[in-house]
């Protein structure tokens, strides 16, 4: 509608059109919408409309006079000829302004317009930022930067900023704090050590989520915040910042009173990953390794004694009747040789059965001597019964030493190397 009027006015010429034809229709239009996305020139406040003739592409033939000065009062019927095209455009724009005439901000811009960076370079001169006046929800933020991890960046001049997932960041061209009282209030908000070079300023420190830049005063006690500072989870603006009292401490003053915005702390920041650790696996409890069964020598010796008692035919010979010591020893040696031949290289014994050890040489000599003595006694005393009676106690006395020198007892000691080999 605006473009049609401007083209028609430019083709016909401003001189040929009567002034009274547009006065009633253009001066009392109905407000079409309060939405913020009507003009691609950007959203502007009332005080910004004076720069419309310089910035926006809607140019007039004589742009020297500002558009608002050529608007007449509603009572006067005479209009300036030069202002006909200006009135056609500006009356619509003035009624479609988003902010009220009292200065109170209306609805904020849409989410797409806030986040979009699709303005071209040609329209960058026309674009101005939408800044509400003293709003509790909308704070002036130029760019939302996300510094995850909370790294402290130190610069060459000693200027340090703690930059973490910033829900608030001061713009690069921030408002200059003009008085030392504001400095004192700003530094007292974050508590800690007193800043250097600021007279009468409350202490400021760096702890946890707070930031404490080394702010150097520039001529006349002014602080120049040229770099963008960020304060995590804090939402405040310099427009309505009121410094707390001098004796207020974080313990005495409640949290909502100390916050300038009066809003609760936002816990839904997407980049704050300090509370939960991502990608950390829980360690499983270490499995207790079961100990391998060790060799129980006492039990093995007991099994060996029972095996020897079963294999030896001493009990059977006693039940059958009196035998000569020669026959008794021969039966013992035959039983052991049969066991050794069975467990030789041809066949293997079961794993649980103890293996009898080979006869020691001393025991072999003892058996040989015993056999020789028994043979001599049997030859010399074959017909004499008394000689046989004397040989029996001697054989019984000799047999008493045999259990002590038996194969499996060996004073309770086993040859472990022989067991492992078998």
UniProtKB/Swiss-Prot annotation:
<dbReference type="GO" id="GO:0005634">
    <property type="term" value="C:nucleus"/>
</dbReference>
<feature type="short sequence motif" description="Nuclear localization signal">
    <location>
        <begin position="281"/>
        <end position="284"/>
    </location>
</feature>
<comment type="subunit">
    <text>Interacts with CTNNB1.</text>
</comment>
<dbReference type="GO" id="GO:0060828">
    <property type="term" value="P:regulation of canonical Wnt signaling pathway"/>
</dbReference>
<protein>
    <recommendedName>
        <fullName>Protein FAM53B</fullName>
    </recommendedName>
</protein>
<dbReference type="Pfam" id="PF15242">
    <property type="entry name" value="FAM53"/>
</dbReference>
<dbReference type="InterPro" id="IPR029356">
    <property type="entry name" value="FAM53"/>
</dbReference>
<feature type="modified residue" description="Phosphoserine">
    <location>
        <position position="118"/>
    </location>
</feature>
<comment type="similarity">
    <text>Belongs to the FAM53 family.</text>
</comment>
<feature type="modified residue" description="Phosphoserine">
    <location>
        <position position="169"/>
    </location>
</feature>
<dbReference type="GO" id="GO:0016055">
    <property type="term" value="P:Wnt signaling pathway"/>
</dbReference>
<feature type="modified residue" description="Phosphoserine">
    <location>
        <position position="167"/>
    </location>
</feature>
<feature type="modified residue" description="Phosphoserine">
    <location>
        <position position="212"/>
    </location>
</feature>
<feature type="region of interest" description="Disordered">
    <location>
        <begin position="245"/>
        <end position="269"/>
    </location>
</feature>
<feature type="modified residue" description="Phosphoserine">
    <location>
        <position position="179"/>
    </location>
</feature>
<feature type="compositionally biased region" description="Low complexity">
    <location>
        <begin position="245"/>
        <end position="268"/>
    </location>
</feature>
<dbReference type="GO" id="GO:0006606">
    <property type="term" value="P:protein import into nucleus"/>
</dbReference>
<keyword id="KW-0597">Phosphoprotein</keyword>
<keyword id="KW-0879">Wnt signaling pathway</keyword>
<dbReference type="GO" id="GO:0090263">
    <property type="term" value="P:positive regulation of canonical Wnt signaling pathway"/>
</dbReference>
<comment type="function">
    <text>Acts as a regulator of Wnt signaling pathway by regulating beta-catenin (CTNNB1) nuclear localization.</text>
</comment>
<feature type="modified residue" description="Phosphoserine">
    <location>
        <position position="268"/>
    </location>
</feature>
<keyword id="KW-0539">Nucleus</keyword>
């Amino acid at each position: 509608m605006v473009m049609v009027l401007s083209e028609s006015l430019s083709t016909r010429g401003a001189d040929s059109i009567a002034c009274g034809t547009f006065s009633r229709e253009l001066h009392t239009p109905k407000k079409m919408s309060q939405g913020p996305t009507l003009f691609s020139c950007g959203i502007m406040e009332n005080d910004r409309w004076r720069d419309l003739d310089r910035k926006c592409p809607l140019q007039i033939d004589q742009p020297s006079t500002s558009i608002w000065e050529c608007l007449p009062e509603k009572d006067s019927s005479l209009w300036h000829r030069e202002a006909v095209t200006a009135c056609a455009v500006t009356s619509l724009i003035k009624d479609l302004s988003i902010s009220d005439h009292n200065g109170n901000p209306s609805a904020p811009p849409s989410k797409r317009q806030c986040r979009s960076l699709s303005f071209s370079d040609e329209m960058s001169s026309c674009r101005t930022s939408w800044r509400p006046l003293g709003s509790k929800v909308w704070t002036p933020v130029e760019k939302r930067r996300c510094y995850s991890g909370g790294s402290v960046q130190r610069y060459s001049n000693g200027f340090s900023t703690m930059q973490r997932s910033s829900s608030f960041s001061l713009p690069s061209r921030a408002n200059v704090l003009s008085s030392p009282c504001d400095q004192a209030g700003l530094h007292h908000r974050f508590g800690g050590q007193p800043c250097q070079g600021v007279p009468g300023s409350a202490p400021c420190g760096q702890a946890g989520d707070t930031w404490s830049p080394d702010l150097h005063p520039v001529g006349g006690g002014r602080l120049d915040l040229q770099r963008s500072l960020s304060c995590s989870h804090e939402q405040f603006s310099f427009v309505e910042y009121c410094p707390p009292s001098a004796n207020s401490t974080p313990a005495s003053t409640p949290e909502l009173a100390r916050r300038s915005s009066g809003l609760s702390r936002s816990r839904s920041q997407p980049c704050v990953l300090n509370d939960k650790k991502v990608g950390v696996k829980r360690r499983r409890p270490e499995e207790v390794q079961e100990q391998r069964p060790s060799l129980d020598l006492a039990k093995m010796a007991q099994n060996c004694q029972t095996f020897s008692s079963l294999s030896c035919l001493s009990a059977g010979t006693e039940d059958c009747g009196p035998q000569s010591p020669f026959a008794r020893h021969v039966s013992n040696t035959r039983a052991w040789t049969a066991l050794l031949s069975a467990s030789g290289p041809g066949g293997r014994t079961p794993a649980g059965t103890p293996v009898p050890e080979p006869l020691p040489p001393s025991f072999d000599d003892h058996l040989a001597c015993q056999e020789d003595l028994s043979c001599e006694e049997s030859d010399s005393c074959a017909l004499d019964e008394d000689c046989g009676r004397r040989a029996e106690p001697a054989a019984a006395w000799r047999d008493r030493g045999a259990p002590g020198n038996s194969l499996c007892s060996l004073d309770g000691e086993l040859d472990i190397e022989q067991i492992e080999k078998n």
